[in-house]
């Protein structure tokens, strides 16, 4: 408790103990100790007895004086740190640290020592090592001091960052399995600026500060974890951290990160959920501006483009461009904007392979994607448009048109063999579901059972699909629709993929009142957890069971329904109005 006082020549409890042990008159010894070590203020001696009369303990008085002096000292240290030339003020702080460091383990004075260290841009190495070696001191020191420790101790910094990265991934994954199913409030709804206010991003931003070395360490952790897990949420964090530092105008980092301007431009596109022609040209300029010998930058750019929020924006923009091309009667190969979107999409999707192989080249675009797959997708858009127009015609002008219900074999093959085709195809499915286009959805569902890398059974697609399906709630009363959706799609993968099982249960929990009773019973049985199912599936299934029980209680039994007479309410008798 009194560690360090002796080094400064200040008497402490041990000195008093020794004095009392060796003295013959303890009361006189105590009085002398108080005189020598009390507050040396002549006017105070006459005031202290007055405090005694009021029953105020001397300890309480001295503690209040001590606290006041400590606060003044802390203010003075902060003032020194902001006054005069840098060299002079740092010299003063270093001298102060040298004199006070021996008190660092004394709880009452520790804040002063920590404050001095906090304001020093370079704390002496010896003192940093002493702080690092003591867990209590390390925990108590300011983040400004910790940064100086971390920059030369990657393992310790990794220990600090690791729990935050785990927390971030858990938050993203739990958002994808949210109980709310909505088109308006989904995983991609929060704006980039809102997302950057999240706890993990803010704490990482604070930990990095303006330290380029720590920033590079975080990026290295994110690359390593992305390679190890293939989890694309690490790519999101890479972009969010850079833009969080951008928001704070941390030029020391933003000016040295070659991806800064590219990320800034892409961030604006994500905010608008669309890549317009002007920004498309800017993004193209950054890609074309990568000089020979600097190709490694492509690895970082691809990781930023692999962020699900970037992929979502690029894919939505691609589908929108295809719709515009249909109206303009233009082929995909003749649209520079569309080709650039595909180039960016390909770079994002190839991020893992590029970083893993360390071959920093843009992926080659499949010619057939542009000359065959996208025109085929445009023909689907034409089918949708002509069918919708026909349905709106007066009865006498309607032609007996039925919506195409088969898929070209080549389309299914594209979804299975080409990642780019699969990604764009899945976003087309999301588009037609959002348009409440039941016919197009039923036509495409069989093609989703087998896709490149099982992308159709990925959490992001299923999260968006289940949200969009809420718009088709009335169709769930039709057994054929439920059979196509559940039996023909979800149940083909739910036994082997727990995430699909969870998304199917989420959808059913939300829409169970609309599902035909016979089909609901069959689905409840089909989605029953097995012995290998995780807790999340069991919890969702339990929730579904509770919802169905509540539904049963609300429904009248057949006997009650038969006994209930027709609702004939007698007219209430109305009193005659009083005479005026």
UniProtKB/Swiss-Prot annotation:
Residues recorded as bearing N6-acetyllysine in the entry: 519
Keyword tags: Acetylation, Nucleus, Phosphoprotein, Repressor, RNA-binding, Transcription, Transcription regulation
Biological process terms in GO annotation: cell population proliferation; negative regulation of stem cell differentiation; negative regulation of transcription elongation by RNA polymerase II; stem cell differentiation
Keyword Secreted: no
Sequence positions bearing Phosphoserine: 557
Principal location listed in the UniProt entry: nucleus
Protein name, entry field: Negative elongation factor B
Species assigned in the record: Homo sapiens (Human)
Gene that encodes it: NELFB
């Amino acid at each position: 408790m009194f560690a360090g006082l002796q080094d400064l020549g200040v008497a402490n409890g041990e000195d008093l103990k020794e004095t009392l042990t060796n003295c013959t008159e303890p009361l006189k010894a105590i009085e002398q100790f108080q005189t020598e070590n009390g507050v040396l203020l002549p006017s105070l001696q006459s005031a202290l007895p007055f405090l005694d009369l009021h029953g105020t303990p001397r300890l309480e008085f001295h503690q209040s004086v001590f606290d006041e002096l400590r606060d003044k000292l802390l203010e003075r240290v902060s003032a020194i740190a902001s006054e005069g030339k840098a060299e002079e003020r740092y010299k003063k702080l270093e001298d102060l640290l040298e004199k006070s460091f021996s008190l660092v383990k004394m709880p009452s004075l520790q804040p002063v020592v920590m404050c001095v260290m906090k304001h020093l841009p370079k704390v002496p190495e010896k003192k940093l090592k002493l702080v690092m070696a003591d867990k209590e001191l390390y925990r108590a020191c300011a983040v400004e001091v910790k940064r100086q420790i971390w920059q030369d101790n990657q393992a310790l910094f990794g220990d600090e960052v690791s729990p935050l990265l785990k927390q971030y991934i858990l938050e993203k994954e739990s958002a994808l399995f949210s109980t709310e199913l909505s088109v308006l409030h989904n995983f991609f709804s929060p704006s980039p600026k809102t997302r950057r206010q999240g706890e993990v991003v803010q704490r990482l931003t604070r930990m990095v500060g303006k330290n380029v070395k720590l920033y590079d360490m975080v990026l290295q952790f994110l690359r390593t974890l992305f390679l190890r897990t293939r989890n694309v949420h690490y790519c999101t964090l890479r972009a969010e951290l850079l833009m969080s530092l951008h928001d704070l105008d941390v030029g020391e980092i933003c000016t040295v990160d070659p991806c800064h301007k590219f990320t800034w431009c892409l961030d604006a596109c994500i905010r608008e959920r669309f890549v317009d022609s002007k920004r498309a040209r800017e993004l193209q300029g950054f890609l074309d501006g990568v000089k020979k010998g600097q190709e490694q930058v492509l690895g970082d750019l691809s990781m930023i483009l692999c962020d699900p929020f970037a992929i979502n924006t690029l894919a939505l923009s691609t589908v929108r461009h295809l719709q515009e091309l249909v109206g303009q009667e233009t082929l995909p190969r003749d649209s520079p904007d569309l080709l650039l979107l595909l180039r960016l999409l390909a770079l994002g999707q190839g991020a893992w392979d590029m970083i893993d192989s360390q071959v920093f080249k843009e992926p080659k675009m499949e010619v057939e994607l542009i000359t065959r797959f996208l025109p085929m997708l445009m023909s689907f858009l034409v089918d949708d448009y002509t069918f919708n127009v026909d349905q709106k015609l007066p009865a006498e002008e309607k032609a007996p048109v039925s919506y195409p219900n088969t898929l070209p074999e080549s389309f299914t093959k594209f979804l299975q063999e080409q990642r780019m085709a699969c990604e764009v195809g899945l976003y087309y499915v999301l588009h037609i579901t959002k348009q409440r286009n039941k016919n197009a959805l039923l036509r495409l569902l069989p093609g989703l059972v087998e896709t490149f890398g099982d992308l159709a059974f990925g959490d992001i697609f299923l999260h968006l699909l289940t949200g969009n399906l809420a718009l088709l709630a009335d169709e769930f009363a039709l057994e054929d629709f439920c059979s196509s959706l559940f039996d023909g799609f979800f149940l083909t993968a739910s036994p082997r993929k727990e995430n699909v099982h969870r998304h199917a249960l989420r959808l059913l929990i939300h829409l169970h009142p609309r599902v035909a009773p016979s089909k609901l019973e069959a689905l409840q049985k089909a989605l029953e957890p097995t012995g290998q199912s995780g807790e999340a599936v069991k919890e969702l299934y339990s929730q579904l069971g509770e919802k169905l029980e509540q539904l049963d209680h609300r429904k009248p039994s057949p006997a009650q329904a038969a006994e209930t007479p027709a609702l004939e309410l007698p007219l209430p008798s109305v009193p005659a109005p009083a005479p005026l």
